[in-house]
């Protein structure tokens, strides 16, 4: 990758005021980042723009937490994402891969062949790229009922964890947990 460039971008808050957002950018050739263009780093003015609580939804999902990324070389990808996010603290996830803790949530980076054991399920297939996302629900039974009522084909992994596969054309999955402890890399 090219050197990082710190920039300020402007956005408008709900009151119509111009707010500066600090951004860290770099140019990448597609060959430099084959697994994904992950844009889940950090958005500083989030607190300003969402000064009121995010409205609740009927599905009871309340927060995006993690992005699950697969790579042929998780060690190299972890080093790159750690550098890009300016986060030096990484943690080994057993033999599955690595976790980079962000200001909100994590990047979980693993080998594609480790995906089936990542959530102890056979839901995810071998791939390179963004394999899934994790979100939190404040009421798993209500979330499951919402999915069922809307004819969404979800999987109940256990009483605290659901999975909602994306269409095959997109691939991947959203994992919905009651809290962060249900995801294997949170420990």
Predicted regions and their residues:
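Glyoxalase I/VOC metalloenzyme domain signal
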Residues: 1-187
